[in-house]
């Protein structure tokens, strides 16, 4: 039978990964310091754990820990000196907030945290640090048919969650079936807000990053095949509903996941201000980033001010993106491109074979669609941005050799693999769309992935 967890007052009950800190002492200027016994963290210390792994491109410098001032995440400084200076982070989409800094170091059995509060007294404000990796997530897989309704879920020290690795979020069904997450406010995750992703597989865990055994793409193919041996069937995994949630200010993604979100419905959510701090960069960042969105419906979501809006990567088979409003999913002109960051668009469909139906959406950002895929039908959309990288990224050039990205396709409406193939291109259909030319004052410049270049 279904188990329901419900806040008696909408958004009244809070499930948090953070603890309030009131033992700050003035260190220098605007910088205060506190000492936290490492026993508080148990076997996971966010202030010694880096955001890093496969498909992470922005360097190994940011930790999963975070400091919050009045529910806003502070920026991590690379040194105590940088924390004291409190200079603007030139990549931030919200530069006025980027002067609030923190820096942590270890001293024996204690974590020492310095923070620049720009003149505020942290003992008189609401100041928290995240200490827990997740907020609501079963330790074991297969805990199915739960409803989580009406909670505020916030401020967890989540880890970078690429497709060939264990994936966590502040709330996650953890490789199970039939969850309903509804009417929640989900915010201030260091990485992912909601994760519909992958279980821990010790033999497929960041192997490219830490063992250099196979390419990340091959590890993803392995993940699909190994998933068959770990219960990846329609009867066991997926069929979740995420509805009417306000998901914001998470730095990897609002909703992410590989394989565990199949047959799900994601509807009527407000997803916004994702990755606006621009501290994290890599190929897993978007309002929603789903691998293997088999028979997934993205419906009536309002997605804006995200690095990308909806990103369906691999196996977007039977996927429908319908009646969504997407706008302002683009880097502001004043912000520099983060080294390791990605280009921006409303929708990105990548190395899939379809069918992928994109219909009745309003796409208002500078770039509406990025297509490195086949088998897309785009119908009845209002399209106010350009298309970009059409067909690009379907192959990889490795050491001067073309390595085709061959990806799986599945028995219709199932997870069982039918085969693998390369992208043949050309099998895309466009019917009855309205294209609006914005007539920019200057020619539209498409930002590159990972550098400050343009086309």
Each PLM stretch: what is its role?
Residues 1-175, 180-187, 193-233, 408, ...:
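Extracellular polysaccharide-degrading/modifying enzymes targeting complex plant/algal/animal polysaccharides
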Residues 158-174, 190-455:
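Glycine- and acidic/polar-rich repeat regions and solenoidal domains
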